[in-house]
Curated annotation (Swiss-Prot):
Gene Ontology cellular component list: GATOR1 complex; vacuolar membrane
Bilayer topology annotation: Peripheral membrane protein
Protein name from the UniProt record: Vacuolar membrane-associated protein iml1
Alphabetical UniProt keywords: Membrane, Vacuole
Chain intervals with Gly residues compositional bias: 1694-1711, 1986-2004
Amino acid sequence: MASRNFSSGVPGHVRPPNWSSHLRQFSRNSLERIPDMPRSPDTVSSNSTIRDRPSSSSRRSRFERRWTVTVNESFARDEVLLNLDLIGDEATPGSLMAIDVFRPDAEKQAQGSHHHHHHHHHHHHKQPPPDRTKEAAESQQRYIFVVKDMPKELKARYPSVEVYVAKHIADVFGMRKGSQVTLTPIDHHNPAIEASHVELCFRDQYMSRSDMWQLAVRELSEKTVYKGQMVLFMGTLKAQVTAVYVEGRKVPSAFFGHNTKPIFRSESARYVLFIQMAREMWDFDSDGSGEIMFNKVVNGFLPALFKKWASLKVRHLVSIVLFARVEYDTGISTELGNPDVQNDYYTGVQSSGDRRPYKDFYRVVVSEMGSGEWTKILYQLKREFNYFRRDISTFHQKAMHSFSSSDDPADQQAALNRITAEASRAIYGNFLEAINMATSLFAHDYIDRDLMRTGISVVVISPSPGIFEVEYDALRRTTEALVGNGIGIDLICIPKAPLHSVPLFRYRNPEYSTEPTHHHKAKTAPSLSSTPKQTAPTIGSFNSMAGSYSPSRGTDITLHGDYAGSGLAQDEWNYALPQWLHVSYWTGESEEALSYHGIALSVSDVSKTRSGDDFLIRCRMYDLQMRSVMETNEIETKPLHLDPYFPHKALQANNVPKPFIDQDGNVFIQNLRIPETLFDHVYGFQKFAPDKHAKLGEKSLWKQLQDYDDSRARQPSFRHTLAPPSHIREYDDSVRRHHADDASLLGTSYTERRPSTSASQMTMTGHRSSQRFNADKPESRNRKTVDFDKLNSKRSPTITPKVPKFMKQISLGSSGFRIAAPKAATAELSIESVNADRSLASSRALMNAGTVATPAKAAINRSMSPQMFASGTPVFSPWGATPGSFAPSHQYFEGTPSRPMPIKSQQIPTDPAANMLSGSMLASTLRADYVPDNRDLFYSDAIRAEDAKKVYNNKLLAGAVPELPSTLSPTTALSPWLTLVNPSNPDSNKVDIATLYSRWQHVFPRPNETRVMKWKSLCSPAAVPLTTEYFPTKAQFESEYHRQPYNVSQNADDELAEEPKSRDEMLREMISLRFCQGFQVVVGPAVAKAFGQKQLKVTDIFSRDHTAEDGTSIFMSVGNTIHQLSCVNGTEIEVNIFVRKPIASAGLYNDRYLYKPAIRTLLDHGYKTRSYDMVAPTPDRNWNYVDAFVAGHNDELSEHLRFWRARFVLIPMTARHSFFPKTQYGDSEEEIRIEGIRKLAQMWQKHRYIPASERSFQASRRKKDMNPLDIVYKTEDPSVVIAAELETLPLLEGLEGGHRKGQLVTSREQFSKKNFSLAALAEAIQQPVENGGIRMQNRRWHLRLHYNCFIGSDMTTWLLENFEDLEDREEAEELGNRLMVTSDDKSKDESKDGRKDGGGLFVHVERRHPFRDGQYFYQISSDYAKPNPPGWFNTRRVPVSVPSTPHSEVRDSPRSNVSMSRPTSIHEDSSPTSGTVTPTAAMMAGGKKPRVVLSKVMKYDVDHRKRSYRPEVVDLHYDRLHNPDNCYHIRIDWMNVTAKLIEDAIEAWAREAALYGLRLVEVPINEACDITEINPFRRPYMIKLAVQPPNQQPITYFDPNSFTPQAQPGRHFYQRALLRKFDFVLDMEPASSFPYTVDVSYSWGKPDFKYTQFIHRSGTLIAEITDEGDILILANRLYSNRTAAQREKEMQQKGGGSGAGGDNLGLGPGPGRISTPGLYGPNAHPDQPNAVSSPLVKPTTAFLSPALRPHLIGPLASGPPSTNGFGTTGQPLNRSTVTVPVTPVIQDPEVIKDELESFCRDRSALEAFYRELLEREAHPPAPNTTPGLAPVKIPSTTATKDSTLAFATPHLGAGQNTTSTGHTVPDTNIPSLGLPPGVLAAIGGTGLSNLSDLQLVGSGTGLGISPVRVGSPSLLSAASAASAGHPSHSTMMRRASVQEGVMGSRIGLGFGGGASAAAAAAQAAAAAAAAGASGAGAAGSSSDAGGAGNIGGGAGGDAGASEH
């Protein structure tokens, strides 16, 4: 793979790439000089595309003449066309060619100056001067295109046109009509200029990385790209090219080749800004302006950032969190075991300094606010600043009372008064914890996928200079969380940049920490370390059996649970540069205010030296010297041992001395090696032995050093090169990714700097493991070769190189994130094993060489895995064994490396290799063949505790000896993601970019420009690049990774493929899926090196038509996982998964680490402590299963796949007739909404994905195509329906499969619409379902029961099946209308006499509708109706214990909507059927529960227009059981689907639904109360009722076939009524509400909600009712954040509509908002005012609006404007003074929350509300009236003369309406009901206070109103009086929800349609009486609307029933 990081130097001779026709050989442009840049030597490609151009004389084009351009002004698909008849055959169609605009002045300049050029441009006359201006560079452009001949018709039309160029190309590249251009073929003489990086921006869409890859391949690859180019992919994905780079230089255009790296930046992302409120935030800026630090943030940086955003018009979502760590001074020493320190109140205890306990605080100031509202953001920030410090400093005074161990309040207060709280300094703050919590926000971004935003960016603003002291564990956790996702972290530092490398994490080396459990839980195990937070019991470098002897601080304390004296602190510090954090410094001076410092000292361009004037003295050198922070005290003097001629041999020892401990506790360890410098390395300065001879007869040390001094006085003329250039690249491969198993701290001792340990000496690579370069004299290397070879033969062919000092500070090696464990005082080799068996065998052979293992042998045997020691070997024990104790034989220590105690060998080994290991410590400069070990042990004679403080200054920790362990040491585990450095003296040429930037490397076109960072990353975050160059070394790869292979082949029967996928297509899908999961393709030569090959056959992922052959591979990596996809066996793909081994210490760390911060969310009134599991393991994915899914072996989306998912609901809106052009006259709101769902269902059915194997079959039976959705509509909630109607529900498993028994007649006997007998048709229709008839049954709608009716959609399906000449449902509907009784028939007699021509077969139950294919109820006309079987109406008289089944009930009917089981009452406390009902369905065979599935799933094609290159199929889940008053649920699941196509489909659904009064809203999949588990910075807001509801509740009635009252209401009746009052709609029911005897599930899983969840009609607010009756409120950010919503909000603001106010819901008066219909946002309101409609009336607080919708009243005719007639107190208001409330287009969730909360806190309002609900109880049914009816008195008022409303009661009649006795009711008797607008809205778009406002001409409508919704006592008394005055006539009410338990007394209004309606009502009443009913029948209703009509009349026991 070619390099992705071009070198500035000339690579010399390179092999040309194997490209046909040389079409893609590129040369660098010569627009300006290319600066040198640091690069990874590994990444220089062997087929680099950068090369010198030949001289112009050698490449003169054959096209010497110039051609004339003609610009195509019209739309053109082809950007350039050539007339090949004129140009000739030298231009071959399909080849690449360059077109250059000819400029004579450029030619003259070029000819005069072309000899200055190192590289030449396209043609000899186009040579630009090297110093030309930018304008000239802009004008000098070339366009490369694929040659295509002009069509014949164009040639005929324009015969003289030579070059035909599209207008947009001509404009960009400076071509005009008649311009002269030259054409040049792209070949090896004239290669294309390949862009190194192309930057694209996009917004308002979610673009997965798979989409980015395909966009680059299909729209950019092998094309010219130019700045400003608009890219459109699949007709919907849009992006714009914002910059083109050639090797770091911006150019106007270049060629997108195979080595070009696309950078995708999102302008609609999510930003989380963390502001660290450390102590310094309140300090003054002493170095700069002198202002307070926080002011620099809110007055400097943030305004500048927000203004940048505004100028770029980006659409980000911003969350801002303030965080701080508060330290507590308890007033007494923690060492004394103060129980308060063990207090669970604290988050932890500081690991250094004063060891104070601390508490972490987080304050959410802004939560997901649009970036355009930045003024509000800054205001909230400034306001919070005033209180933040006070709140966190006093929090403990309240919070610690509950944690106090004392029961005496006085003692508690005294203890609290002693504690002082203070914010910690930034360096000790909770920096990593904040980042870790931020990453948890997006750990599950595949759930509730936001389809409008791409990218996540976390910005941390800190007063720190860029260095943080962190715990290793926190660093490990954060790194693990970040390396696998696409989150970028930017650090903005407020102070000036320091002089050391940044960003820097300072952490204690975990190898020295011996505390076995987590810091604030370590109450039992003794600690051997002063690091309270380290959980790995690893062994310290100077630990004895008794404890630790490493340096400690005087202020160190012992954590609670530790015993004092258990050990002294091991202050061993490492300094790490993370690859996932990028730092900037706010200077506040200019647009260049963010000076990017990052790793400036490490990789800055050394050639650009700064002038002396730039240097500012900013530190006190003396202090640095005293603290040993500098590299050396003698700044200019190099350490002696770095000189190649220094006599290192003199500094060697021969034996292994025996250590001993004196009575003072000092450990005396005899030198293994004589000190190699002139002063003692032992910090006690107690003993100095310079005269020890390494061997007998050798010169004394003094003599050798004297000779050296003399030789140095005679300076040689030639010095050996310490860094031979030929080996630099070899170093990089070995060190760059292995960065040292060994490493040192901020190591400053010059004794560490030996030539062989410097980076320049490292020549070992994965495939040159036997070579070492030695800077010493040649003979020294040769002299040692034999010994090494002997050792190597026993041990391993590979040797791990010694890593240079600066790399030791940050270990990237095999032991990961912490420094490799210190080892015994023995000469130990660090060997990387290539073969596990050989390494283990050889190590054990060495170990068993002697009877007692030497320390060296023990050290060799030591590994990162569980440790095994030979018996008798003294070991360091992390559990504090006594001195001299021996470990048991073969003792295992799980988790951490151990270090054998350096003891004197009991026998001298005779084996040379063993002697080499145990006998002496050789300088690595003398013997480069192996690596030195712990230097301090080698040099020390004794270590005194008081001197130990200095030990960390010159630690040098050697690498571990891997034995291919099953686990990795902590240092190795995270090595690729950190770079250890000495921050004060990093080697500027040693840090490799590929390692330093790792997966983000290819985002930086200019990696050398590190001093200044533009605003780009803060304004438009980049997605994780598609490619990376990082790959482990061969040794790492073989020793640290497990391999899991499997093969995948395409399933030939894959139903989701049009035809079987080719292997290339399957490979592309597998790559796409991995891109979506965060993988990157590994490019560059590192892969080949890791496999020990010079070259690998690697697939080119950016090739458009590349065909993968057998043997080709592609490597993809993410985190610690590498996938190799290889083509094998012709059709198969072999997958090798390489997974890094787990961390060795995992068992010893507290894996369930609970982090306990105090968080205050946006709406909280105070801080609340909560525990978070920071180590929640992410389960490994089963990639075999995933790839099997891609290959088509299974198509079910299971949780193993981690598929993307989103949930949507359709919320019923209050509709206006002006917005329903598609509906027919007379539809109610409810009917319109059901029609909208039917339209959506038709759309889904039309575009459902049909497998290719079924298409021919589907085409042949198109007319047989039944509606697969088969949605069952009920007017009760699902739990109620399941409890009451279980046995007849078609959703019951077992009923669905055979619910249609096929056609009644064979094809020969089918009817024909041209000629059929009406009587025969009627007979066939009324056959039992099993005989082919249509399902006839009693059907309830709201309060009305319709007998023996069928549904329009069922009839449509039946007609299609039984008529041979019907082709589709439209024709069937047309035929059904011919069979209808016409509307002009006035009576059934007329129908009987007048309809003999094929009509008059059936009629709408209310005669309101013609025949429709939908949820409409029809009955067979009396002429053709079969007589009802005996006992048809007897079902309510059947004993309740035996559910009865009417004759019409057939189990395989598609619509069994009436249950014959006993009536039930729903109560959420218990099962709805508990104690009273045992459904017959529960008696299934085998005792299994009956199973009901409430939703279905279908495969839906989101690309029905076939724009994509692949099938785009999602799983669409939809409700099967729906109550039109509730939300309709839709859920989408997908894998490997273009998200933008899904978004387009959803927007189309939203537009369609909005036309029918439905709002499509995205809602969270999980319920609101669980939000904190996903997002720790959000918490539901709890609203408590000021007055608890009374225990007395109304009675709930429910029975599907009768009105027998039941005695138990639903739970939380008042709370549900309250939410509905505030316009909330039921979303999801809790799992507990379903009967326990029924197995209820959805197509996506089991119901799992704990509480009942509602959603506001605006879609912006979610509410839940808890078990205690409290209300939880949560903003629905998924919906309110949509960009469409923001656009509409802007439109509304421009329109000037008022926001809120006016009524108690914040809905102010004013004009209705104008909104675009169907927009997919919270403002997508279906209501639009016109000239005739008044503003939409919204229910006020007096009424329960949603549950009391007048679903029977549709937008029939416009009436005069009116108001609701009631105020917020429930009292009637004067119409002249009432302002009509308007439902605004936008309702902020905060406004709704405030209104709801204010009402809930108002005791008087709540009591009045409860009273209104209970007043129904005060009016029991009057004995002298129809049972179940309360006396109702309704005042009469004058109505309009033309009112034609038909009522079922005399005093509610009007016009020509008659009662059952035939009396005419005069218009003047029509009373004024004063009904709420929730009932009377949408009749002409008006609210009505007077029935005269209803203009219902010639149609029967039903109006049912529950008194629960009527808030006026006066209305109730009036209704009672009216009822008492006419006891003989029944009134009928719409039923309320059963769960609400609405009482039985109802006001019923039946509006009939003329005299016939009254007659029908009378007939129904008579029929009911004849059937034995105690009272008359139901008020007539439409199937959808519940309106009254032809079947109305008296209501006996029915009248009191409640219905929803």
